[in-house]
Amino acid sequence: MALKTFKPVTPSLRQLVIVDRSELYKGKPVKALTEGKISSGGRNNLGRVTVRFRGGGHKRTLRNVDFKRREHAGKVGTVERIEYDPNRTAFIALVTYEGGAQSYILAPQRVKAGDKVVSGDSVDIKPGNAMPIGNMPVGTIVHNVELKIGKGGAIARSAGNYAQIVGRDQGYVTLRLNSGEQRLVHGQCYATVGAVSNPDHMNISLGKAGRKRWLGRRPHNRGVAMNPIDHPHGGGEGRTSGGRHPVTPWGFPTKGKKTRSNKRTDTFIVSSRHNRKK
């Protein structure tokens, strides 16, 4: 889908660039595949703010998206329509399987209403089909990749995202991610062929602060603009750079500080995403 720009009849329209969603389905989602979603406003179960600068925004209905693609394995599904989902950057596709069962899946690029999709151990290599990643040829573009067998897709799920199979060895597949990282994934983990829809999402410009508020994002004020009581970067006469390496409001290093602590899975990372920056 293309991008939309507007004549600058108002200041906010001058900068506005959004994705043209005129081809998407304009009705409501399938009620059986949805559930209510209560906005947390960035608060936890104690009512304390755990994520700053969140709150407000439009009320959303949660669409139950099938990330596993195993329940209807072997059944041919027909894409009924492509829909907008307010809970993610990608579009979703409503699929009706043989027997009448329906589910939502992440809509891949170049998949449209009327197309057939299927999942199973040995299916055709075409966008929208899901199978164990070990059964795909080297060079295949994939998305919605599982990290644990049967747990559901975890890698390459956002708009325009994908990973590429670059090798295969001893039951594991080597994937190259968009970040540059190369990672081992078990060959029995499911993945879907193709790239995720809505690749133009990266080019949008919201044009005004209010549009960010509609998405549930509140103003993000900088530490250097605060008083010393409120932030380690606060205070000083006139504009300052903070006077120290960037830290969080609680004094922990940030902006470049490595935070990965899951050493148990380090063995699956063949090449770190940081290597290409050296």
From Swiss-Prot:
GO terms for cellular component: large ribosomal subunit. SUPFAM superfamilies: Nucleic acid-binding proteins (SSF50249), Translation proteins SH3-like domain (SSF50104). Disulfide bonds: none annotated. GO terms for biological process: cytoplasmic translation. GO terms for molecular function: rRNA binding; structural constituent of ribosome; transferase activity. The keyword Ribosomal protein applies. Keywords: Ribonucleoprotein, Ribosomal protein, RNA-binding, rRNA-binding. Residues 223-278 are annotated as: Disordered. One of the primary rRNA binding proteins. Required for association of the 30S and 50S subunits to form the 70S ribosome, for tRNA binding and peptide bond formation. It has been suggested to have peptidyltransferase activity; this is somewhat controversial. Makes several contacts with the 16S rRNA in the 70S ribosome. Belongs to the universal ribosomal protein uL2 family. Part of the 50S ribosomal subunit. Forms a bridge to the 30S subunit in the 70S ribosome. This is Large ribosomal subunit protein uL2.
